[in-house]
Amino acid sequence: MSKQVEKIKELIAKREQARLGGGEKAIEKQHARGKYTARERIDMLLDEGSFEEVDMFKLHRCTNFGMEKKQFLGDGVVAGSGTIDGRLVYVFAQDFTVNGGSLSETMAEKICKVMDLGMKMGAPVIGINDSGGARIQEGINALGGYAEIFERNILASGVIPQISDIFGPCAGGAVYSPALTDFTLMMENTSYMFLTGPKVVKSVTGEDVDQESLGGASVHSTKSGVTHFTASTEEEAIQMIKTLISYIPQNNMEEAPRVECSDPINRMEDSLNEILPDDPNKAYDMYKVITAVVDDGEFFEVQPKFAKNIIVGFARFNGQSVGIVANQPSCYAGVLDVNASRKGARFVRFCDAFNIPIVSLVDVPGFLPGTGQEYNAVILHGAQLLYAYGEATVPKVTVTLRKSYGGSHIVMGCKQLRTDMNYAWPNAEIAVMGASGAVAVLYAKEAKGAEDPKAFMAEKEQEYSDLFANPYQAAKYGYIDDVIEPRNTRFRICRGLAQLACKKQNLPAKKHGCMPM
């Protein structure tokens, strides 16, 4: 046997060793938890045979606490590039079978390498997190590794899409990387995120709480809004990531992939002509409007369990990827509040950063009143949504279906925020406030002296409605470009987006804006 053949056999053996991660027993434990290994997850995510691994043989350099005896090839993270539906992506997956997936200086170097490559090549970076946190034995070097990753998250923001999958624990400083990325997905029952764990919470505050209640997928998908998606199985999670990737571009210099569309752009949807209740205060389901107008009724929702009074997500019109922002009248009448404003603003800014047109479907009676909202800075959060719409230079199309009152009218993509196409249905009520509220302010004194105050106020409400509670007053001043028949909504949106395909709009030169936080 020649030396070259011996070397090749040695290489093959080392590769096999590296692929075992922490060893067969550790892999069995991972499977016993109902979880896949890092390599299995990457294999499910990427096109078959497309994965190109880097730093397979890298080892940590720590000698503290006997760590020199705990060496595993790759040091607990699998990293490299591959394709999803033929499109280049960079990926890293922490390997819980190696030292609990704890982050070392070496692991951070591997993660940073693929992040740098993603920036250089203009391709999305997908991180699969399953880690016990910083490798304590390495001390400050592990913390420095986190900081290196965070800096790259920041530099890559708005340049390439960044997606975080939480498939296990993610605690302490480790949570900041997913928080800095564009989208986060958490596994139900097997993943959690928090800065301080239950034991620390107990020792500091005396509060008894378990991991799931403190930072599980349910908490972060419904209460905090930290995560955008949840999945019950890893297969489902991987498929969600693939679907998400299909709607977004490779980087901020490109557009999202356009797909072939067999759904006619001039398809009339007669059901929309009767979808609004006769009573303007009665709810209806905005999802029915969305699925009626988008290509083939397909809508990929983002943060579906958080701030349900506003709906955001991706769809297509004539094969073109768009971001949908819509008020939901069946949840709190579609009012805007702190969480809805945060959710909407973040999504609008992502779409603008990555050249995805924004279609807004408006039915909003105002902002939610109350001390709870004011104490939680609804002013600042509402201003975030206003800022996001006003800053966005992508094509913007707004359709007002029914109510659009006061400040909420402005922040939901009004004409003065440089929205390109503003349409309204005939039922639209575009005004400072609703008729009853306006009349209560305008005629309070006169009503007291009226022979029949109720009849007097009813008459004045009707007068106000006739004057303001319609789309024609706004159309008269050019704030609405056209009043359209509801069943024509899909066609008008498609045609509007086609007109705006070559839109170019520049902002004043600046280092960056100071968005209210």
Residue ranges of each PLM-predicted region?
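Ligand-binding clefts of soluble mixed alpha/beta catalytic domains
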Residues: 1-517
